[in-house]
């Protein structure tokens, strides 16, 4: 066994492997739990919908800005992952209204949330959908059963296998698209 440690991160490990290092045990410590690339996580609350007093519906709300990246997506939303049926790889993630339904046998048009003139047509029958959001709490009660550590590991391995190689590379990776449904695009 050949081990390496001391301030290892993904870039150094990738470089050592590219140089042909025969290391088979990696001691990643500090850089496993910290992020040099993004040491702070910025989070801001933005109102997206208000529940109507008279019924169960949500009234969509939007924050407008001259900077298109700061314009919010209005409404009560959910997110689906779109997989390519032939390869099982991720085509895009789709933000849509919570009560939207989709027919996988029909064409779907999805819109870039920032550069809204960019749209993609996905041919019906070539994709499958999986909703990503699951309820954790409902009416103040926990309704979620957490998977075991080994189940979480298996889920991570399965999901990593759905990424294209181009999105997994460290240098200049392709992005996984996160787009809007046609309905959400038109509401926005």
Specify the residue positions occupied by each region the protein language model found.
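Gly/Ser/Thr/Ala-enriched C-terminal appendages of enzymes
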Residues: 8-188
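Short beta-strand/loop segments at the ligand-binding rim of alpha/beta enzyme cores
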Residues: 1-4, 23
């Amino acid at each position: 066994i050949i081990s390496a440690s001391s301030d290892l991160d993904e870039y150094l490990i990738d470089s050592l492997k590219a140089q042909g290092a025969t290391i088979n045990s990696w001691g990643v410590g500090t850089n496993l739990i910290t992020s040099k690339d993004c040491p702070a996580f910025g989070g801001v609350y933005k109102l997206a919908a208000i529940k109507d007093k008279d019924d169960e519906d949500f009234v969509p709300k939007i924050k407008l800005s001259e900077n298109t990246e700061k314009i919010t997506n209005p409404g009560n939303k959910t997110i689906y992952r779109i997989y390519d049926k032939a390869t099982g790889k991720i085509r895009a993630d789709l933000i849509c209204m919570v009560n939207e339904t989709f027919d996988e046998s029909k064409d779907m048009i999805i819109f870039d949330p920032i550069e809204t003139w960019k749209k993609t047509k996905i041919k019906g029958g070539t994709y499958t959908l999986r909703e990503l959001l699951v309820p954790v709490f409902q009416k103040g009660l926990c309704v979620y059963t957490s998977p075991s550590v080994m189940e979480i590991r298996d889920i991570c391995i399965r999901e990593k296998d759905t990424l294209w190689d181009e999105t997994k590379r460290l240098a200049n990776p392709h992005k996984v698209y996160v787009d809007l449904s046609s309905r959400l695009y038109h509401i926005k």
